[in-house]
Amino acid sequence: MEFSSHAQSNIFNVKNGQITFFSSTPIENIQAKTQKVASAINLDNGDIIFKVKINTFEFAKKLMQEHFNENYMESDKYPFAEFKGKILNPQQIKGNGTYNVDVSGKLLIHGITKDYITKATIVLNNNQLSTISNFDIKLVDHNIKVPSIVGKNIAEVIQVKIAAQFNKVEVN
């Protein structure tokens, strides 16, 4: 991944991006959110990275947050989730506008790395860039085990939404 700056920087970063996830079952819905996502995007070559500390996700119920960190995600053992990838068609992003792009990369969660391809929307407006992406994660793909006693309360597939407002990296 290449994020070195040059005179005409096309690199954008953010330290307070947002990730929400949603689990829907007939018994209960569970939602969590963090606004502590760090990310960088290089529009010249399409490189993209997102990184989040697992224990920053907040739940409506403290007990859910505790179970999430201690029992399911084991956030002491696996403190971060990270996506490294590429915008597959970065050359289409020319000037201000809204762009629908394909993103491919590797998602590391719970010590397991899997390949993902998803769609994202990028809005470029001068020195600011915003992104939105929605995708699903299967718990089994990342070896996240849910005890059978609560298995009906947690979906096997979690809906994830990433949204971030980036600023252009200033070059000295």
Where in the sequence are the language-model features?
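C-terminal segment of classical bacterial N-terminal signal peptides
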Residues: 1-6
